[in-house]
């Protein structure tokens, strides 16, 4: 698992349009760049969880 600090760092790097939000495409890129394999369905679940 990643620490919250690592995730925050990822967020800053991948929030390309700097709007404070990461879209599904950006999130998929983050996760895949960390070496994890993730499906589009998993990304959708993460996006739903992240909206809370």
UniProtKB/Swiss-Prot annotation:
Ca(2+) binds at residues 15, 17, 19, 21, 26. GO terms for cellular component: myosin II complex. Residues 2-37, 38-52 form the EF-hand domain. CDD domains: EFh (cd00051). Keywords: Calcium, Metal-binding, Muscle protein, Repeat. Belongs to the troponin C family. Troponin is the central regulatory protein of striated muscle contraction. Tn consists of three components: Tn-I which is the inhibitor of actomyosin ATPase, Tn-T which contains the binding site for tropomyosin and Tn-C. The binding of calcium to Tn-C abolishes the inhibitory action of Tn on actin filaments. This is Troponin C, skeletal muscle. The lineage of its organism: Eukaryota, Metazoa, Chordata, Craniata, Vertebrata.
């Amino acid at each position: 698992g990643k620490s919250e600090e690592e995730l925050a760092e990822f967020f800053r790097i991948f929030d390309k349009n700097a709007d404070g939000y990461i879209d599904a495409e950006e999130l998929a890129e983050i996760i895949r760049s960390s070496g994890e394999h993730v499906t589009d369905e998993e990304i959708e679940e993460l996006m739903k969880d992240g909206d809370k």
